[in-house]
Amino acid sequence: MAQEIERKFLVQGDFKKNATSVIHIQQGYIINGMVSMRIRVLKDRGYITIKGPGNKSGTTRYEWERELPLDKALILFELCGIHSINKHRYLIPVGNHIFEVDEFHGANEGLIIAEVELSSEFESFEKPVFLAEEVTG
């Protein structure tokens, strides 16, 4: 099982001009205590991800992910009910990292969050000007 190490930030200002790609994502969650199952639908592909609880700082947690046939992912997505989101994800290269900036729609309209995956909790990274308050954890 892989460990996911990431930091998250609110976003302010123009971030779209440096995006190299954008994709529409629908995802739903089934949560049981500190463990969550995420069903993600991207175009014609589906994924299931199980995430464990985060460490004290919230930057690291165990994650297991597999691709699913789209028809199965759509069935599981329906089971998530109101625990679903709709967003556009922009990929923005900055230095040696790719920032994933999510612009939410629907009930979360106006929320924009950037995340960067790291190889360790202590890895340094170049902070782009569009990053605002850190919300990791």
PLM segments and residue spans:
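Phosphate-end processing signature that detects enzymes handling 5′-triphosphorylated RNA
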Residues: 1-137
